[in-house]
Amino acid sequence: MSVQSITESNQPPVICLMGPTASGKTALAMALKDALPCDIVSVDSALIYRDMDIGTAKPTKSELVQYPHRLIDLRDASESYSAADFCRDALVEIAEIRSNGRIPLLVGGTMMYFKSLIEGISPLPTANPEIRQAIEAEALSKGWQAMHDQLAEIDPVSAERIHPNDPQRITRALEVYRLTSNTLTQLTQIKGAKLAGDVLQLAITPRERSTLHERIALRYQQMIDLGFEQEVIKLKSRDDLHQDLPSIRCVGYRQMWQHLEGEFDHDEMIFRGVCATRQLAKRQLTWLRNWPDLHWLTTDDKTNLAQVLSLLEAKH
């Protein structure tokens, strides 16, 4: 069956290309874009930020001209972006791509985004600062154990899961109840809109863990050489950014920020940045090893493109 017949026979399939950081996802996505009538959609919680290009390994401006990516540069570094935000935006992009008879190619390493899109996400309310302040004030007066006891009365299932010494999660569970009159347990059993139609799920990673570690270290040094420090200096010069923001908590940015604060020297920053990136890759691989219906590809395997085309044809 030809590539043309894949897009014409039914609703075009969605390709999900996942993998740990530095595994070669972008290179394979570009090869697929050359071979297929597809549009790339980024699935990366770091690439959504503007002015954070080097430390996120965002494709270069020239690459983006040739291989446009949707869902990048959506937010300022001072703003947040949730899995629910991603699902909403991704479903719109996917519908538009499919309506043009093209294949949506979702590429990235933010596994929670993929999971939320494929399985649907619970319709939880956004944070409410006033209610949070009220809960925190009550906790200051009564103590967090009393707040946990309060949670146990209205939502025993959540209280069983949440430790009494976890104020952030206690606050969220109480906040959800006060906002909706439904418990967190009730709402998480409801799933929202999710990806429909044919989905081909792929994961790419090197055969050996040591190879992935080498690629991570090499890429981190390349980021330094490209001016990563200057990128973070520019971000740090802003009055509205700080270490607790999701953008600055991105791997690499946190370590560079701490270095610029004088917490450790340049060599230690590189060491910590590489270690944090390795830990991220390990978490990503843990997600993927438990992922159903996944086809594995090996980094730098010359047959990857042919394998994907064959899998697509087998689906139709």
Curated annotation (Swiss-Prot):
Q: Name one GO biological process term.
A: tRNA modification
- Region entry Interaction with substrate tRNA, spans: 44-47, 168-172, 249-254
Cofactor(s) for this protein?
A: Mg(2+)
Q: Which reaction does it catalyse?
A: adenosine(37) in tRNA + dimethylallyl diphosphate = N(6)-dimethylallyladenosine(37) in tRNA + diphosphate
Enzyme nomenclature, EC number: 2.5.1.75
Oligomeric state and interaction partners are given as:
Monomer.
Q: What does this protein do?
A: Catalyzes the transfer of a dimethylallyl group onto the adenine at position 37 in tRNAs that read codons beginning with uridine, leading to the formation of N6-(dimethylallyl)adenosine (i(6)A).
> What is this protein's name?
tRNA dimethylallyltransferase
The organism encoding this protein is Colwellia psychrerythraea (strain 34H / ATCC BAA-681) (Vibrio psychroerythus)
The organism's taxonomy opens as: Bacteria, Pseudomonadati, Pseudomonadota, Gammaproteobacteria, Alteromonadales
Q: Its gene?
A: miaA
